Amino acid sequence: MELTPREKDKLLIFTAALLAERRRARGLKLNYPEAVALISAAVMEGARDGKTVAQLMSEGRTVLGRADVMDGIAEMIPDIQVEATFPDGTKLVTVHQPIV
């Protein structure tokens, strides 16, 4: 199977998000890469479902709360930018203050 670098990146994010979901389900607090992956994957899947950029910017802030991440992680992530594929093309989605 031949994948483009972009497709490889998407698969890596999805895999990290899957791991983060499992750890979160076990009651573990997420670290920086796990938190970023989980929020990024939620944005990418929302785009694939046909949601708008504005909806995803808003929904991206509800994926995780401070109680879901290790101490100091929320402050380490002022915003997350995700290049997501929408029905009408690829767009950059920025989620400001993703962990509140």
Swiss-Prot record:
Gene3D superfamilies according to UniProt? Urease, gamma-like subunit (3.30.280.10)
* GO cellular component term, pick one: cytoplasm
What keywords is this UniProt entry annotated with? Cytoplasm, Hydrolase
Top-level enzyme category: hydrolase
GO MF terms on file? Answer: nickel cation binding; urease activity
Give a Pfam family name: Urease_gamma
**Entry's Gene Ontology BP terms:** urea catabolic process
Q: Which subcellular locations apply to this protein? A: Cytoplasm
* CDD domains, sorted: Urease_gamma
**What pathway is it annotated to?**
Nitrogen metabolism; urea degradation; CO(2) and NH(3) from urea (urease route): step 1/1
Q: Which InterPro entries does the entry mention?
A: Urease_gamma (IPR012010), Urease_gamma/gamma-beta_su (IPR002026), Urease_gamma_sf (IPR036463), Urease_subunit (IPR050069)
**Keyword Cell cycle part of the UniProt annotation:** no
Catalysed reactions, as listed in the record? urea + 2 H2O + H(+) = hydrogencarbonate + 2 NH4(+)
Enzyme Commission number(s) from the entry: 3.5.1.5
Task: Tell me the subunit arrangement.
Answer: Heterotrimer of UreA (gamma), UreB (beta) and UreC (alpha) subunits. Three heterotrimers associate to form the active enzyme.
Entry's HAMAP family?
Urease_gamma
Q: Which NCBIfam families match?
A: PRK13241.1, urease_gam
Q: Which family does it belong to?
A: Belongs to the urease gamma subunit family.
Kindly provide the name given to this protein in its UniProt entry. Urease subunit gamma
Species name = Polaromonas sp. (strain JS666 / ATCC BAA-500)
The taxonomy runs: Bacteria, Pseudomonadati, Pseudomonadota, Betaproteobacteria, Burkholderiales
Gene this chain is encoded by:
ureA
